[in-house]
Every structure is written in C-alpha cells, then in structure tokens.
Amino acid sequence: NVHYAINYLQNPDVYHLGERAIVIGAGNAAMDVARTAIRHGTRHLECFSLSSHITASEYEASYAKLEGVNFIFNKKPLEITDKGVVFIDLNEAEDGTLTEIPGTEKLYPADSVIVSISQGPCTTITDSTKDLKTNTRGLFETDEVGRTSIPGIFASGDAVKGARTVVEAVAYSKTVAEAMHELSLIHISEP
C-alpha cells in the first residue's frame, strides 16, 4: 500500500490508507498529504525526515502539528515491507552531512506509506529548447505572470517556484493562465 504524494493529493477520496500511515518527507507537500490523510480517517500519522528539521514552511508545519501529525527526525528509510517501513537512524554533523548509525534499524508499522520527497526538475524541455533560460536550481526563469525568455512561452507551478503547497501552485497558475488568455486575445484581434 505505497503511494506517491502527487497521486494521493489528486484524489484522496479513492484511497483507503488505514488506521496508521507513514509519510516519507517533511516538506510542504508532505504537510498537505499528512493533513489530508488525517481528515480522511487516518488516526496515526507520522512524517519522517532525514534531517533534524522540517523543511516545510513554519505555517504548514504548525497546522500539521495541530491536526495531530507526529514528526520523527534523522531517519532514513531502508525498506518498505507489507508491515511498514524499516528506518535507520542518522547522525547529522554540524555541516549537515548525514551518516547512518549501524545497528539502529527499526520497523515502524504502517498500513500505508506515502512518498513525498523532493524530486529534481526534469530537464528534457530545457535541454532541447534553445534560449529557454533556467536558474541555478534548474527552474524556469519567468516574470511575475509566467512569461519565459521565449516570447509566447509561459511556465508555472513547481517548474518555476520550486516545491510549494498545492494552494500556492494553483494560485500562481491562475495568474499565468490569465496572462496567457490576454496574450491570446491580442493575437486574435490582430488582422
């Protein structure tokens, strides 16, 4: 019973996660997943983070805590089984380097597991499209309404802003859609 965050968030009503679920990840998307799962009947939900902190915004994390999400830090998933997830403890050095602590493997029981970890941007489009500019993180460079470095080409969502909440991505995408609509009206009215 393993799912990916994006699939779960698209239609959480079709998933039955059971009483106990684990979310692997501690970013904004993981907070969305955790809160949604609790609202859909999961009683025990734990979010696991590799590091000693939550990468989600303070706002998102505080609401997740209020809704009953438990956070477990410095754990690396080793294996997902039909009984849950085996994690190993991690030591975090001052420079942020993480190292496994041998002998600390432990099974955390779960009916379901949702993977909500950051994924790097897909570079297929940028690698094959001349003059489409990206920043150092591989995200599209745009203006405030999503126009890219190529006239008539727009970009939105995580490809521009990086990992954010679904609400933020949708709000920005609406702004971009309005700009695209305005551009299409200009082209339609031109002879």
Per-segment meaning from a language model:
Residues 1-18, 95-163:
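FAD-site-proximal beta/loop scaffold in flavoenzymes
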Residues 16-42:
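Rossmann-like NAD(P)H-binding beta-loop-alpha module
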Residues 26, 49-52, 158:
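Cofactor-binding loop segments of dinucleotide-utilizing enzymes, especially the Rossmann-like FAD-
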Residues 34-78, 189:
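Rossmann-like dinucleotide-binding cores of NAD(P)H-dependent redox enzymes
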Residues 78-82, 120-122:
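Feature captures the FAD/FMN-dependent oxidoreductase FAD-binding
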Residues 159-181:
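A conserved FAD-binding loop/helix module that cradles the flavin
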Residues 184-191:
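Residue-level detector of conserved catalytic or cofactor/ligand-binding positions
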